[in-house]
Structures are given as C-alpha cells and as structure tokens.
Design a protein with these regions (language model features):
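Long, contiguous hydrophobic alpha-helical segments, chiefly transmembrane helices and signal peptides
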Residues: 7-11, 43, 55, 92
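Flexible, charged surface loops at secondary-structure boundaries
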Residues: 34-39, 82-88
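N-terminal secretory signal peptides and thylakoid transit peptides that target proteins
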Residues: 1-18
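General structural signal for secondary-structure boundaries
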Residues: 14-17, 23, 96-97
Length: 203
C-alpha cells in the first residue's frame, strides 16, 4: 500500500492528466439579503500560474489566509492541514491544477468532507476561457458576473468562492465564456480548477 507521502507526490503527476468531471471575510462581501458564508480555514493557490496567484491575492484582500504551493501539497498537508483536520473538519478552497485537488479531495474523505463547489477554467483555441461551473445556486448567480469581469476572472472567482453557503443547498451547472487575460504559451494553458472542500452536512 502506498504511503501518504507517495500518494501526495502522485498528485503532482496527476496534474498533467485529463480532468474527469469536474477565515473571516471582509465586509464588502456581506449583504443583508444573502445567506451566511461558510468560514474558510485557508485557501490554496499555485505560484506557477498568474491566475492562481491573482486568486490568492484577492482572497488575502478579503481576509482569508492563503497558502502558496508549486504543484506539491506535501508540506502544506504534513505541517498545516493534516494537524488541523485531526482537530476537526474545516472548509478549505483553492485555485489549482487537477493534481492538488485530486489529493486533497481524497484525503478529505477520511474527515467526512467533500467537494461542494468546482469550476474548471480552460483556455480555448480562439483565445477565450471556458468556465464550467458546478455548485450551489447562490454561487452560480455570482459566477454570472464573470462576463462583466472579463480578463480579471481569477479575482472574481475568489469572490464567488467566498460566497459558498455553509449548509446543503440546491446545485446546478453552467458554462461561461470570458476573454483571455493575455496571450499565453502552451505551459500557461494548463486547465485550472477553483474549488471548495467542506464538511458533509447531513439532511
């Protein structure tokens, strides 16, 4: 049987595989006509990808602690998240490649947690970005504003993720197309995923 460390390192390689399926907040997110937000323990961003960094920067601005990685979650898992989850499940979020989410999702199962929101962000051949979004309806409504945000989609997705409701709610799927930020080379065209992993709420 593979060790936890070997499993985490496998997740780095999984980043290159095709994708199968898909803290406190500052007052500028709070409105009286919306449900409460789920507290996020920490968000994960990947320093290799500018859009992921923009996501992390916006989350920090919103008051959510952010942790930078470079494809490998081993250090984050061993020295931060695993000790915290052993005390009790807390929600995390991120904008990463497939590998880190693959590992974190499976590790979360041991703590009665699951992915409650996921959006795949993929560069199209015509220079635009396709956002395939699956999650709670309230987050879908905020995701619709991606079109207005245009090339600054990553910062807007941080605000969408920050609207994740704390309880089970109706979910739906949608696809949104936005302009690409800048011209990119092949290495920058890796599909990214924004996601939320949270405790399972029993009906």
């Amino acid at each position: 049987m593979a060790s936890r460390r070997e499993f985490l390192q496998f997740g780095i390689a999984a980043s290159a595989l095709p994708i199968a399926g898909t803290g406190g907040l500052s007052s500028d997110l709070l409105t009286s006509d919306e449900p409460a937000r789920m507290p996020l323990y920490k968000v994960v961003f990947d320093e290799r990808f500018p859009d992921s960094v923009a996501f992390g920067v916006e989350m920090k601005r919103l008051g959510v602690p952010a942790h930078g990685i470079r494809g490998d979650i081993t250090d984050f898992w061993l020295h931060d998240l695993d000790p915290r989850w052993k005390k009790g499940p807390v929600a995390i979020a991120g904008l990463t490649a497939h590998g880190p989410l693959f590992c974190l999702e499976r590790l979360s199962w041991d703590h009665q947690m699951r992915v409650v929101f996921c959006a795949e962000h993929r560069c199209l051949d015509d220079g635009r970005i396709e956002h395939a979004i699956s999650g709670p309806d309230i987050m879908q409504r905020h995701s619709a504003e991606l079109v207005a945000g245009g090339p600054n989609w990553a910062a807007h997705m941080a605000r969408v993720v920050a609207h994740c409701p704390p309880s089970r709610s109706e979910t739906s799927k949608t696809t949104i197309i936005t302009p690409l930020t800048t011209a990119t080379d092949e290495a920058d065209r890796v599909p990214l995923l924004s996601w939320v992993i949270a405790p399972v709420v029993k009906a």
